[in-house]
Amino acid sequence: EEIFSEQATALYEAGVDLLVCETMTNLTEARAALLAARNTGLPVIVTFTIDKNGRTMSGARLLPCVITLQSLGAAAVGLNCSEGVTAMAKPLAEALPHAAVPLVAKPNAMDSQGELSPLRFGQEMQMLLDAGAVIVGGCCGTTPEHIAVLRGAVDNHPLVVPREIDINAVAVESEAFFIDDNIEFCEPIPCDSDLAQRLIEAEDCSNVALLQISCQGDVDNLIEFGGMSRLPIALHTDNAVLLDDALHRFTGRLIV
């Protein structure tokens, strides 16, 4: 986070209007960049690069990234670079119903067959506009001609306006969870060295893992093992300092 802060501060002092944290490969890195950049007071956009299966190098999907980063104050979230245009359509469509911020798409002007012509690029970008992308552009291989054709596609496409949504959602890096009235907390789980195994066992008796935070070591274990959970995670603690540390460091969105 400190390294990102140095970069963000330098750009802010140079007079930029917004900050873009792009080609992120995991949610931990993206959170750190956003937390550092937002201290400038400037709008911050965060975009990830994904493979042909719609996941980052760490296995993250766009949906949990959107849920996490929009709750931390990102101005927009989305994708750039990646495996071309077609790889982005499904992740964007999946994220759209739960996005309270604009979605971004800046793909490479190429696919598995090679470079895309400006005309072909503009035609394929229609998929991403249809999927809900509001802020669009290009990454590797794009030229002024590609952007000119994209401009025309945008002008002829109805604008998708982000709407207020009821975000009863939490997330770990690889999964999003949507909370309803049927919450069943497990018995409080200590965040000790056996946390990974305890999280597996909790899946058999509840739909929310309730973790007890009592000391700094508990927070450290949460950060190390919490991302393995296949359940949404809720925290219970009487220590505000520990809670703040856990919320600041956890890769995802928690129930408190």
Residue ranges of predicted features:
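Domain-level signal for soluble alpha/beta catalytic cores
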Residues: 1-256
